[in-house]
């Protein structure tokens, strides 16, 4: 696996600069109440920088045993741990970037059951311990690109999804893989209240083509920064598909089902003209309400000196994955 393009050391966010009280920052910048009345997604390019509590906690899960294969270690400077665990989209716990860190402690992740079913010869059920012990874990340093045009670099820990699927033995009828998040409204306030949860239909669902799911880059992720995932990052297990926008990285997965037909996906159901099934990172295909040509790396300059950088096709993984989409119109199949 060849190394990808890398970012400058100056783009790494210092531990002390990112989390500031929203009211203080908005007042300092003279942002009016009218700006705050814009639709949530319409000001993703602006307000997502000003949300949050003072210092959401860094990951505090148990330490994991894992290897660091050279193929997945690179020159990408890491986004600090407190930013990775404190600046999240997980609408089941609220719309604000700091809400998941503040509210996700209510999620019970042990015991846990993950079922693999559908078009497979050998259906499987994994428990909480299986997720960290059944497969050799490895650390992979990946870019993470949100559809809101901000990005991070994260040292995820997990195992390739294809290893799990191989155990289940997909049949010749399997063409797609459908994923589902836990439905637990008593633990997830966004599932209980449509206002808190952004009006989405829950449980959250996602999907991939089978060849995408079997690609070596696609990771079943159980840890970050050497420890088990914290709830706000999708504990105990989430999906990471680094060449796709972050909303494809479904969190807190309880079901994986192989299917003949393309499965529904949450954001495509909510706004099909804005969020496609493929969701490949593409600087040439804009979101209807903002450009995808550049992105804001969570960096050391602070919110008053935000440095934008060009968005890379397939998030910098084109050499590895472009062949999956040969002959496919990426503008039409966004």
UniProtKB/Swiss-Prot annotation:
Names of required cofactors: Mo-molybdopterin
Assigned keywords, A-Z: Metal-binding, Molybdenum, Oxidoreductase, Periplasm, Signal
Keyword Membrane: no
UniProt-listed InterPro entries: MsrP, OxRdtase_Mopterin-bd_dom, OxRdtase_Mopterin-bd_sf, TAT_signal
Keyword check for Cell inner membrane: no
Annotated CDD domains: YedY_like_Moco (cd02107)
Catalyzed reactions per annotation: L-methionyl-[protein] + a quinone + H2O = L-methionyl-(S)-S-oxide-[protein] + a quinol; L-methionyl-[protein] + a quinone + H2O = L-methionyl-(R)-S-oxide-[protein] + a quinol
GO cellular component: periplasmic space
Cofactor, how bound (note): Binds 1 Mo-molybdopterin (Mo-MPT) cofactor per subunit.
Binding, Mo-molybdopterin: 88, 91-92, 146, 181, 233, 238, 249-251
Location in or out of the cell: Periplasm
Alphabetical GO biological process terms: protein repair
Entry EC no(s): 1.8.5.-
Gene3D superfamilies noted in UniProt: Oxidoreductase, molybdopterin-binding domain
Modification note: Predicted to be exported by the Tat system. The position of the signal peptide cleavage has not been experimentally proven.
Signal peptide: 1-44
MF terms (GO), sorted A to Z: metal ion binding; molybdopterin cofactor binding; oxidoreductase activity, acting on a sulfur group of donors, quinone or similar compound as acceptor
Enzyme class, broadest EC rank: oxidoreductase
UniProt xrefs under HAMAP family: MsrP
Family designation: Belongs to the MsrP family.
PANTHER family, A to Z: PROTEIN-METHIONINE-SULFOXIDE REDUCTASE, PROTEIN-METHIONINE-SULFOXIDE REDUCTASE CATALYTIC SUBUNIT MSRP
Quaternary state and interactors: Heterodimer of a catalytic subunit (MsrP) and a heme-binding subunit (MsrQ).
NCBIfam families with a match to the protein in the record: PRK05363.1 (NF003767)
Function statement: Part of the MsrPQ system that repairs oxidized periplasmic proteins containing methionine sulfoxide residues (Met-O), using respiratory chain electrons. Thus protects these proteins from oxidative-stress damage caused by reactive species of oxygen and chlorine generated by the host defense mechanisms. MsrPQ is essential for the maintenance of envelope integrity under bleach stress, rescuing a wide series of structurally unrelated periplasmic proteins from methionine oxidation, including the primary periplasmic chaperone SurA and the lipoprotein Pal.
Annotated protein name in UniProt: Protein-methionine-sulfoxide reductase catalytic subunit MsrP
Organism from which the protein derives: Escherichia coli O1:K1 / APEC
């Amino acid at each position: 696996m060849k190394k990808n393009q890398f970012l400058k050391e100056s783009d790494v966010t210092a531990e002390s600069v990112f989390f500031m009280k929203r009211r203080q920052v908005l007042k300092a910048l003279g942002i009016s109440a009218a700006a705050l009345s814009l639709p949530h997604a319409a000001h993703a390019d602006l307000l997502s920088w000003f949300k949050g509590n003072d210092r959401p906690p860094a990951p505090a899960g148990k330490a994991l045993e894992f290897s660091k294969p050279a193929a997945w270690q690179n020159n990408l400077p890491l986004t600090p741990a407190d930013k990775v665990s404190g600046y999240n989209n997980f609408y089941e716990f609220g719309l604000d970037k700091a809400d998941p860190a503040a509210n996700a402690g209510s999620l019970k992740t042990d015991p846990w059951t993950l079922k693999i079913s559908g078009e497979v010869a050998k259906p499987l059920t994994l428990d909480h311990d299986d997720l960290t012990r059944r497969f050799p874990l490895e650390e992979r340093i990946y870019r993470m690109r949100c559809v809101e045009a901000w990005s991070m670099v994260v040292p995820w820990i997990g195992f390739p999804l294809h290893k799990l699927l191989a155990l289940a033995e997909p049949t010749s009828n399997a063409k797609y893989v459908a994923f589902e998040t836990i439905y637990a409204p008593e633990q997830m306030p966004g599932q209980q209240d449509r206002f808190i949860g952004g009006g989405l239909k829950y449980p959250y669902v996602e999907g991939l083509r089978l060849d995408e799911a079997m690609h070596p880059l696609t990771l079943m992720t159980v840890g970050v920064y050497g420890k088990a995932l914290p709830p706000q990052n999708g504990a105990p297990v989430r999906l990471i598909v680094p060449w796709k926008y972050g909303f494809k990285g479904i969190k807190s997965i309880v079901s994986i089902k192989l299917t003949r037909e393309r499965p529904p996906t949450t954001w495509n159901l909510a706004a099909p003209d804005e969020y496609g099934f493929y969701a490949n990172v593409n600087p040439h295909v804009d979101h209807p309400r903002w450009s995808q040509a550049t992105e804001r790396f969570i960096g050391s300059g602070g919110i008053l000196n935000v440095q934008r950088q060009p968005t890379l096709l397939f998030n910098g993984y084109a050499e590895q994955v472009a062949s999956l989409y040969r002959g496919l119109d990426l503008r039409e199949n966004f």
